[in-house]
């Protein structure tokens, strides 16, 4: 989910392959077809196992967690002005090479996407003034020394 959140943080039109929204894994069967084996694009073109879609509403399942989180992220992206195509986009130094922080600014509003690309708990060292809202949970927070679990991300806006 963290990689999809990162992709949705970027400008432009995000792309999901069919099945990504349900956690479908790569299909390597194309390597057994002489006409397709040299074209790695087929890794994403396997048949969709429709039984995965049956659990998309149940957040206790992998499929449900992925589907519901992506749905929420897409809604936030549509609602937040900082995702405008004309927003200024920067990286923000948090003093740890395994954490990427993306800052988007537009019309006086700010968005921070903070992504831990490590499997270990890390701290994003930040000292932002003012309160920000966690766009996923609605909780208010100061952006000071944000702790992230392995592969965790946060989206904050003002």
Predicted features and spans:
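C-terminal beta-strand-rich structural cap/linker in extracellular carbohydrate-active enzymes
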Residues: 142-158
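Active-site donor-binding loop signature of nucleotide-sugar glycosyltransferases
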Residues: 50, 137, 158
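A general secondary-structure boundary signal
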Residues: 103, 134, 157-158
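Loop/helix patches that line or flank the sugar-binding groove of alpha-linked glycan CAZymes
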Residues: 1-111, 117-125, 129
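Short, ordered coil/turn segments that flank beta-strands lining enzyme active or ligand-binding pockets
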Residues: 106, 136, 149
